[in-house]
Amino acid sequence: YIAQKVGSILEEPQQRGLAHFLEHMAFNGTKNFPGDDKGLGVIPWCETVGIKFGTNLNAYTSIDETVYNISNAPIDRTGVLDSCLLILHDWSNYILLKDDEIDKERGVIREEWRSRNSGMLRVYTDLLPTIYQGDKYADCMPIGSIDVINNFPYKDIRDYYHKWYRPDLQGIVIVGDIDVDTVEAKLKAVFADVQKPVNPAERTYYPVTDNKEPIVAIGTDKEVDDPSIEIYFKQDATPDSEKNNVGYLASQYMTSMISSMLNARLSELVQSANPPFTRASSYYSDFFVAKTKEAFALSASR
């Protein structure tokens, strides 16, 4: 895996959707896997060794992170591990972003945008400005703006890439039956030429404003005929630096127990003669889409 601590939340208004677009471009030509007469692309090379695109080779873009992965690679075969590390290396700083490939991908993204533009997604997107009144999270869905996808100049996606894909915001995760020392040495050698930029932009983690009165958000769409209700009880997110503390782990265990017991009671209600809902659950997680706020949530639907 190569995990980027960046996502659609860091896009400028004219870049809405380009974090996700960039994820697509990572498979359309890199320095060592150009996908032209100079060499195989990432997908064709992976498929020559049995790594199937969509199953063992994939990526996702969310609001605060973007993650690429290669899994079930046959590393017992000579050179496969080295080549997989080279792909991660290229994704980190050497995606080609050629003009013609960008233009070809616009059509792919348009189709994905069309197929994903469901009633539930529209409701979800429409609710964000009410839930996050005035906050950055009010307009941050990774699928972005179709107008931007159709018309953005090439420079905008390159600016996003070179501004945010950099070593201090990246992590490499390797899991498997490997010799740790050998793989670590290979990793350091492969990534030796990837340098942190001078005076990099600050990676801001946008806060969620507290509210004095309850926020009520109602979303409707003609395609959504399964009514549901959710209630969130917000609180500040736990800093990452505290998540290895015994106190935090004990608190998480207690919260998990509370959710389990409450879910058991909700399940009993669902199975009663005349239940008030057909599905219900409780959970503790990020507040809707924001990682800088957490919430205990209850949801129910008919």
Q: Which functions belong to the PLM regions below?
A:
Residues 171-227:
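An aromatic/glycine/proline-enriched structural segment found at the starts
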Residues 1-71, 122-123, 139-143, 260-294:
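M16/MPP (pitrilysin/insulinase) zinc-metallopeptidase core fold and M16-derived inactive scaffolds
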Residues 108-126, 130, 208-226, 268, ...:
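Short acidic/His-enriched helical or mixed secondary-structure segments at domain edges of catalytic enzymes
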Residues 29, 70-105, 287-302:
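M16/insulysin-pitrilysin zinc metalloprotease superfamily fold
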